[in-house]
Amino acid sequence: MGHTINNKTAIVTGASKGVGYATVKLLSESGYKVIAVSRDLSKVSGLVGDNVEVYQMDITNANEIKKFYDKYKDITLDLLVNNAGGGSAPTSIINETMDNFRRAYDINVSGPMYLSQLFVPCMKKSDSATIIFISSLGGKFPYRSGGNYTNAKRGMMALVDTMRLEFPEYGIKVTEICPGTIDTQEEKRDIALTAEDMAESIRWVASLPKHVNINHIEINHILSGK
């Protein structure tokens, strides 16, 4: 098998579907020991195997994040994929609610920040540690009715930029991947990336030499007449 990795450990959030699910499968097939994190264990039970264990956690709940860290605080962590994300249904700013806006930030910014912060000691033990944030082109190019989602993804971009300045002193690389439309269970499009496309990108970033950091990746489907 190509791209085989031995004795590496990864954490993937939002593992119950789409990009997270595909990433857990690909990394485990490549030799990673993967901890797949999801709010709903019933949706990740099919991932359990020799290289995969699952953990139930809500990324918006600080107490649950801390309990998760306490369980795994002694591991050497090589890769953290902050994939859990999302927002409420599309709405205009004039109709936005504080609860939805705050929850979008907790999912996309506050939760991933806290998770990354806690696991720094585990990643410092790795020969080459990487944190990957799955963002969206919507954070760079806001659109009407993007509301809490596009604003939260813009906040994630600022978080990643700050971490990229601060985390190299701990030997940790930080990358943000911004896809366009992804073909998922919720969103079926003829012109869209697949979850597997994203998983391949994540594995590639994680495989780079420790002195090479990819700051930011924008990925789109190629429009073709063929």
Where in this protein do the model-derived segments appear?
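Residue(s) in the substrate-gating loop at a strand-loop-helix junction
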Residues: 136
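C-terminal helical subdomain
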Residues: 176-177, 189-226
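Conserved glycine-rich cofactor-binding loop
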Residues: 16-17
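A short, exposed helix-loop element centered on a Lys and neighboring polar residues
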Residues: 116-117, 161
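Active-site helix of classical SDR
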Residues: 116, 152-153
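Substrate-binding pocket helix/loop in short-chain dehydrogenase/reductase
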Residues: 91-93, 100-102
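Active-site-adjacent segment of SDR/Rossmann-fold oxidoreductases
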Residues: 141, 162-172
